[in-house]
């Protein structure tokens, strides 16, 4: 007994360690006090423990040898591993053993050697060498502690004990365990059982696995083998073996735990069932569960005993789990394996993943069960994490709980399903898993159990929700069943599936499960819940499981998030790590840390692995399983990894992740795997991802997690939670809990988390979830979070509504969704819900646009960035839920269905800030969000930025998230308003409130924004259209053309591109683009151009160009190669760049802000980005300077403009480099024709740095252009051809270049260039000579430029040449300026431009960008000066003083930059004192956002005339062509006047960013002065049609949308802000009810000043008011905002011109074309007079102003006519409409068509129509 005592001690130590572990890793720990204690103890006892453990281990080894022969065999191995883990393992093992055996313990234990067999099987897949090491490492790291946790995982006790124990150990252990466990669990038997099982199992497999995974690593294999042998062990194993040999074994393998579980499970079931064999079989079926089972097997008995405990415990116990486990769980779970994995995702992915995870889980499970508690708990989190364990545990517990059959039995059928799996077990498992996983996550998730019950189903918490889904969760099977049940209720589905599932492959599993569902995820899908992933997968279906990743990838990103995509690997890994990691730690399950693990864990269970790390494995389902199906033996992790790595279909990103999951996660792999076969386990797992996630833990991490964490969440989902995790959170719900807490629930949490990231972080990110949900809608409607309210509400909502509503997210979710909904209760299910639902579509669906996450994401995607809400689309959509639209729903999957929940809405994910939310929701927040981002917490405003979020990036992940979070929320929120919220507009909002997301719906379009992208490329792709749509949603309206166009290009142009990477980048780009995501794919990846690229690459390679990526010159350039590359990267990945930019957003600074000028311009432009805002700006920002833009060869096109836009895209440094090379300008002629990918490739030709720069520039331009083109798909084909031709030209040029290069390089100017790039001056210098304008000019530098000049001349502008005049040698600036107006100011302008760096170029680019090809070409004059002009524009505005503020007046142009002379440019403007300063100028100008500056400059410049080019650019390259002509300039000038106003609008945007206030102030002043400028412009739209025309062009202007777009993007808030416009003459009152008396409202408004315009649109619930001064408007806004009038609370926001235009457009719902006129007219008068009267008017005019407005209007009308104006604004653009919108409509050709150019008429007439 000494040993026992020692064991006990060890166990205690283990526990302590575990706790410590928990504390450390999970945060979930016993009570805080305990935690502290544990910590202290840990420190104090660590050594002691280690020593004791060692001693004990030695003893145990001896005992083990003595005690159990089989075990003995196994023991040594175990022991060895255990050594690492040792004591812990042993004790647990030991303790658990007896309990396991309960009666049969000894025998059982022996049988559990079945476990060993399992283990043996597992081992291979479980521990790849690399992981092994890690595992070991971990163990070692932990030294004493980890082992204990491991042990705990394994058994709770020490690893050795297991050895020791099967026989004796069991007793001893039992005692010990009992003591420990009991204490902990309160169930000795369980503990023991768990231990035993764990022991055997764990020890064997787990032990080793866990333990070692490290120590056992090798052993594990042995063990595994043994296990397998044991598998033979008929008694227990037969079933399992047989059933599972595959199942079991596979499952087992799958689950590691599962397998083991299988055995164990058998036991479990057996125990429970009593019938080992039988149980076993069931288990086998379960197999996935198996783990559970296996574990349970032993456990079960104990469990049986425990059951109550379990139940209670479970609930409780589980709870305990939660409790114990919870804390312990964490500890242990994390305990060791997991922990390590967690900590060491990499380790775990493979190892843990499977093994550890599984094992741990199992063990844990066992333990859990047993100890469930402690051990388990202790065992850990890991175990728990394992989900399995948790699941299992839960299972057990749950099962027990339910007994689970029911438990999830609740699902009952589940049972059936499980049944097979021992229903219970399965169930358990599933459940547990669910629970565990989920629950676990829940922590206790027990919530399920514990939580309950609710959980019961909880189990799955997820479970529950998963509920049964939960079960599924884990098991998927059961879960499936359950889930199915749950969710589909269907146990059935699951169930059936389940059963088979267990064995089935993961995919299967899912499939099976889903089978019914059909879908793997389906499972989920099926259920929504399950959906879990599945669903989304739905399609993925089988894959689902595996899919996770896939979905992820595809779509889901989210999943991806989870799984791979997101982080992709990371995802899982991410989850794993990220989330999971923490999560796992937190949760045992979490472990799975990542998804992977999570999955793993969860997956493990069920394939958990699969998901989990496994993803690699396949489904995970076991790996094997996943890989499953057959594969009983899992392939070696290593092998799997290899496979994964070698897979071509995987997203490299996923694989590539280094961190986290490293590749390990294999999410992809797994996904890939899909294998279907066994539904098994995976099934439940189903979620594997979910599961894990669900499991939550991970999930939690994943979903859960986050929530749980929710709070924190930060981490990601899971991570944060981690402890919190579900569990912690107590989870309770994890979701719930989290929910609760978070309220946000996802949202909340997410929101909270902000992270959202987590999910999508990016997307989701809260986005989604959180915010998104927000609207709650959904999800949680319940306000609470998921849970809570959810429950009810949620439940209701979701469930209810959702629920069936399927609504739920799921839509599919059907219930699942319901689950979600249900989930409320089910919450879990819910989880699933989300998953499901969302997933359902979403996830996988990707497409689904449903938004799916992806969608959502997509939506969210960044564009949504804000999404969050949007992502929320979820949320948002939800709003739409309004019914709105399914889209919304769609979004949700319909989930929005929940729209219904609209009620819920309030809580909405977003909820976090209910108030806001509600407000938001209620109100038209779209705008509000926009306008008042502040109001909303949700970061909102920036929405964009937020979105940027970070992206989802998960990349950034989820960076976006943040935004998302709030933002998302915002979006979401906005969404809620659904009404149109501006978001709507966004969404257009489609219904959308979803806004972005909504879009989603749209078709998935969804996601318009990003969504698609989010979806990832996949989604994107498919979606892409959608996405595009998304934009448009509008897309729709807008056109698909446009969108598609946008999207279309794969690149999505910026969109995509940005999105692509940008997913994160998102931010804007991404966001917008998110689509960007696509980009990624597109971009370097080649996207669509890939094919050409390869040959091209080959050619270059042959030429020797390719290899020398970095050129000496480059090096020379002051830009370092790395930097250059970075730049390239950025440029390539617009998204990324964008991201950066976006982040800088405020400044709109490209990453290379330093290149202030350039950057500034870029960013601002970015805003304006001709591209569409979105793309363009993105591109721009991204590109920074993309003078190259001139890509487009046709000069007529707004080449001039685009360059401006482009310039910004390229970083100055890049430019610098570029010049070094002296490339042949001719190369750049490729300009627009080349695809970004091509360009990117070209840019890699090292020999010619300049070339590279040029390529980058071109790439950026093209991206922008492509976006535009995509908008106008028609063009794209031709463009593509052109690109190819140009590419060919470029190649030949390169060849020449190589020859010429050195000479050129020698040219001083060239060298000078580098300098230029750095500073605006250099740029200027270069520009002047090069006429590259802005950054680009630098590239060519004088020497090269001439070449360019010749080469570029018309097409040539290419670089930034913008053709400009092709002056070649003559300074572009000069040329441009002369062109502009021949005004001297031009020079200044150029200087300004230079100052801004590439700003001008960006401006050009921007303008031209969208239509880059058109514009780019020098747009001759325009083009030529475009860059500069653009840049200048900003500067131009400022007086000659060089202040940005200077008006466009010619005199104002900043001095031209002279290479040797410091450029005085526009620096140091005192916004306060400088009358010429405009907000934009200020922002863009010296300070922060060059972009802004640029914008302003553009605007001003417009005034100047020079600006006109910019203007055009901004407005629309289309205009440029005309604009290009002098007349255009003139027009521009006219426009200019408008521009300023416009600008003001923009300004606000910028203002929003940055110095918004300054800008505003400036604006105020400026505007006046600008107004003065009016001389240039006739009354805005009216007087000069031409100007209008530019705007007409405006389509581009639309782009101007930059404003919009950018604004939106840059700041949604900006818009919002901007919307608020900070000081804008226009106020948009939202949330008006039809009962409001217009006259009263008008009277109230008049109290603050004379109303130039009062446009009441009660149908939109909005009123557009224009004051004569911004001050009045500001005063009115302050007074009116949140003012309670009648039965509503008015939201007053400043409206930007764009918004106004939209508003008007909406107001006049005439056809878009017509609208413009109508609105235009309406506007016109409005605007006109206003314009004349007030600069703002003109600005409006600009925008709206005649053209602009009209356009906007129109677009708005079209797209968003309905949209709120303000919102609408956003919406409308939808870009499609408005922004792009109108043009959109014609966007595709808008450029080409003069119509846009149409003037002012626009207002009156129809710029749109024109």
Swiss-Prot record:
GO biological process: miRNA-mediated gene silencing by inhibition of translation; positive regulation of nuclear-transcribed mRNA catabolic process, deadenylation-dependent decay; positive regulation of nuclear-transcribed mRNA poly(A) tail shortening
Biased composition (Gly residues): 809-824
Designated name of the protein: Trinucleotide repeat-containing gene 6B protein
Amino acid composition bias (Acidic residues), ranges on this chain: 1-22
Protein function: Plays a role in RNA-mediated gene silencing by both micro-RNAs (miRNAs) and short interfering RNAs (siRNAs). Required for miRNA-dependent translational repression and siRNA-dependent endonucleolytic cleavage of complementary mRNAs by argonaute family proteins. As scaffolding protein associates with argonaute proteins bound to partially complementary mRNAs and simultaneously can recruit CCR4-NOT and PAN deadenylase complexes.
Modified residues (Phosphothreonine): 1426, 1441
Coiled-coil segments on the chain, per record: 33-75
Subcellular location: Cytoplasm, P-body
SUBUNIT field: Interacts with AGO1, AGO2, AGO3 and AGO4. Interacts with CNOT1; the interaction mediates the association with the CCR4-NOT complex. Interacts with PAN3; the interaction mediates the association with the PAN complex. Interacts with MOV10; the interaction is direct and RNA-dependent.
GO molecular function, one term: RNA binding
Biased composition (Low complexity): 88-106, 165-174, 207-220, 248-260, 335-346, 363-380, 416-425, 475-486, 1295-1307, 1792-1801
